[in-house]
Amino acid sequence: MARVGIMETAIRDGHQSLLATRMRTEDMIPILEKMDAVGYHAIECWGGATFDTMLRFLKEDPWARLREVKKRLPKTQTQMLLRGQNAIGYRHYADDVVREFCDRSVQNGMDIFRIFDALNDTRNLATAFEAVKKSGGHVQGTICYTVSPVHTVDKFAAMATEMVGMGADSLCIKDMAGLLSPMMAKALVTRIKADHPEMLLQMHCHDTSGYSEMAYLMGVQAGADVIDTAISPLAGGTSQPATETLVAALSEDPELATGLDMGLLGEIAVYFKEVRRRYWKFESNLLGIDAGVLSHQVPGGMISNLVGQMREQGQESKLPEVLLENARVRADFGYPPLVTPSSQIVGTQAVLNVLTGKRYGNVTKETKNLAKGMYGTTGQPISAEILQTILGDEQPITHRPADDLQPELGAAADEIGDLAENIDDVLSYVMFPQPAREYLQWRKEGGGPERELVAAVIGAMFVRPKKATAGQAPVLMAANGAVEQWKSYGRQRQMR
């Protein structure tokens, strides 16, 4: 019997990390039957940035994707990433929104909810925990791992115990920046499993620093039950380590073997290798190991964002200075984990501090809200000096931020009107008002068939029967007939 379970991230975090979350549902559907037969513990297929990207760029219904994927995975659990009170958006939502979103997610086919808060503030997890359990879903309480003087094994273990008391069905150590060292993985897993031997413990690591395979090995030897991996064509860099590599390595120890079908994994890898080539335009620039993250602690996606901001200002040469300032801003704010939305808040403020030449001379609204406690409490209290600089005489709140929010669903339903065909559409609108409205209007006006025709025409205008260049050839060679080739290429032109 398999001792270590594998959660496959290819159709969520794999392409989110490497291909800007652009993989379309039609490129997932053909391989799901084989993925279902592999023997995965779960397949991550939803949440994170997928919802926003589908509405904003792909003109797809996120709820329809979930239903289509679930329909093709009768043997395998589905899993998603939920940002606590932020759900799958970028701000705190009222409790009625979070409850309805969790219930509708279960009804549409979601099994396991990995629920985290960017600041590790468990008050921001409570409503989602309660809602998922009430709807019959599985609650995975999540620790956002980070490195700082205040983030110790004791602190993380205390959070795990608190989440167990809140009703978590399993626990996860989420290492979004690739900072979890092998020794810390061993220490943290050992402690949590000693405190809660009955709880399934899962590890989620990114390969940014090159630590992840070693951290996984030490973790499973210490008692971790499940690890997250991505099939090899969508692995490495800022994604997870390769599924096949970990399966093969663990198979050498009968007590750790996963029991996954390596033959099927090979076939799945061949499929996704071809799929990835269709998305060459969206390839990440961060494909290899970045050991620098071990010092500056900035996740790969956040570095891309910082580079973009500096490039817009013609100040790319100041990136090293921004990375140093990023660490200072993070320390000023009590060492929040650098994950959405705290990573964007800290990073943008660091850029402003460097470009203006005056620390906190220009403060963003989000920075002010972080200081006010509008996102929750940070790893340690923010110093009085920083609070005075940013807030003046205004006092930060001490209660749960969402307690100040009034119910939102009723007003949202009135605003979107008959563009929404059901409550799922209303939820999409609440999360992403403008992208959802544009998508729902497009759908009402006909959507699909016209888009296919336009995509084919655009593709036909740009495709040329010339010798293919490296990286682009698969886009033109992989489809089933000329029109399909044009559509594939044309869609990517539309996503610009």
What do these predicted regions represent?
Residues 1-19, 66-71:
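N-terminal amphipathic alpha-helix/helix-capping segment at the start of soluble metabolic enzymes
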Residues 6, 14, 35, 115, ...:
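Conserved, mostly hydrophobic/aromatic
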Residues 33, 103, 130, 161, ...:
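Alpha-helical segments flanking ligand/cofactor-binding loops in enzyme cores
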Residues 42, 47-164, 171, 178-181:
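Active-site beta->alpha loop and helix N-cap motifs at the rims of alpha/beta catalytic domains
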Residues 466-496:
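Ser/Thr/Pro-rich, acidic low-complexity intrinsically disordered regulatory segments
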